[in-house]
Swiss-Prot record:
GO cellular component: cytoplasm
Assembly mode: Homotetramer.
Protein known as: Argininosuccinate synthase
Source organism: Psychrobacter arcticus (strain DSM 17307 / VKM B-2377 / 273-4)
Chain residues that bind ATP: 15-23, 42, 123
Functional pathway: Amino-acid biosynthesis; L-arginine biosynthesis; L-arginine from L-ornithine and carbamoyl phosphate: step 2/3
């Protein structure tokens, strides 16, 4: 990554949410670098109005303001390819934050080139994974990019000091509409909403009921289950209950329905790439349904060894994304294999949603490898000769028999 003297930096493109941190960063960049700040705000389904970010940026004298609806690109080119892999980090985390960063980094770099900017900037702290994800993504796409990470440079180390800075610099932080300021650090997109900080910093403390925003508690979910039919084409959901939908529409609908049934709540302690453990709570209704349903259609259409190979490679794929290497040779290689495996992953999965649980209750496909004539417990009319199993078992047990014949005790 290239390094420049601050005096040579005249334009900076900032990933800007319009919130407290990035508003302060915008002003800090203007003062510290005496540079023009260009803001970029991405709508990736966070469920909030992004237009207020424009007014806040204008109030700080920012002339070039980019606000973009990236929901479809995010779902189509990032989330859906990841779900073809059934990716889960450390057995539980569906990578909701991890998968959102590459697209933002990509647009930061592209906007910087459009404006001939000297640097990009983000609001990720020096303790988290996001700084790594943003900067690895940026350097992979623009090797000479200069990234300014204020949290690693300034001395504003607490929420109180940030508020004092905002007051001193006449930065308007509008909390209107928030009757109760959340004690949590939250991040949302089409795939999930995350919660960190507050009482969650004690890993033994249970999250408060009023923290959750996207879902009801399973106990309060409807007493009647809801069934959905999800239609797949090459590993991607293309319709719900017969209604053709775009990828981002699929996620919006599944989030809404899943949330009503208490689907997708998660409370975990994860290992960050930077070395520390972190406790976080997540709501991922759509992702939880998508993962279960995708495994359901794959169980019918994927060859056994192809399915097992995917399962073996999945942890590596998930770790690659979690650590910030979406734009990397290894992710591209793994993606090519994964996408090839989805050639015949077509059909329909029927899922049941009930009080926090997702169950696959039916699956069908014209590309099914399930042969009822062979699998039946009834008369198979000679489709499968059970005597063939004797030789199969003998050959597979040969090495074990040889071990035992040499006096080796395999029972220990």
């Amino acid at each position: 990554m290239a390094q420049l003297d601050p005096k040579t930096i005249n334009k900076i493109v900032l990933a800007y949410s319009g919130g407290l941190d990035t508003s302060i960063i915008a002003r800090w960049l203007q003062e510290t670098y005496d540079a023009e700040v260009i803001t970029f705000t991405a709508d990736i389904g966070q469920g909030e109005e992004v237009e207020p970010a424009r007014a806040k940026a204008e109030a700080m004298g920012i002339k070039h303001i980019h606000i973009e609806d990236l929901r479809e690109e995010f779902a189509r080119d990032y989330v859906f390819p990841m779900f073809r892999a059934n990716a889960i980090y450390e057995g539980e985390y569906l990578l909701g934050t991890s998968i959102a960063r590459p697209l933002i980094a990509k647009r930061l770099v592209e906007i910087a080139k459009e404006h001939n900017a000297d640097a990009i900037s983000h609001g990720a702290t020096g303790k988290g994974n996001d700084q790594v994800r943003f900067e690895l993504g940026a350097v992979a796409l623009s090797p000479d990019v200069v990234t300014i990470a204020p949290w690693r440079e300034w001395d504003l180390s607490s929420r109180e000091s940030l508020m004092e800075y905002a007051k001193e610099h006449n930065i308007s932080i509008d909390y209107a509409g928030n009757k109760k300021k959340s004690p949590y650090s939250m991040d949302a997109n089409l795939l999930h909403i995350s919660y960190e900080g507050g009482i969650l910093e004690d890993p033994y403390a249970e999250a408060e009921d009023d923290m959750w925003r996207w879902s009801v508690s399973p106990e309060q979910a409807p007493d009647v289950p809801q069934y959905l039919e999800l239609e797949y084409a090459k590993g991607d959901i293309v319709a719900i209950d017969g209604e053709a939908l775009k990828p981002y529409e699929v996620m919006i609908k599944l989030n809404e329905i899943g949330g009503k049934h208490g689907i997708g709540r998660l409370d975990i302690v994860e290992n960050r790439y930077v070395g520390m453990k972190s406790r976080g709570c997540y709501e991922t209704p759509a992702g939880t349904i998508m993962l279960k349903a995708h495994r359901g259609i794959e169980s019918l259409t994927l060859d056994r060894e192809a399915a097992h190979l995917k399962d073996e490679l999945m942890p590596r794929y998930a770790k690659t994304i979690y650590n910030g290497y979406w734009f990397s040779p290894e992710r591209m290689m793994l993606q090519a294999l994964i996408d090839k495996s989805q050639e015949y992953v077509n059909g329909t999965v029927r899922v049941k949603l009930y009080k926090g649980a997702v169950s696959v209750v039916g699956r069908k496909s014209d590309d099914s490898l399930f042969d009822e004539k062979i699998a039946t417990f009834e008369d198979d009319a000679g489709a499968y000769d059970q005597k063939d199993a004797e030789g199969f078992i003998r050959l597979n047990g040969l090495r074990l028999a040889i071990e035992a014949s040499r006096g080796r005790d395999l029972s220990k």
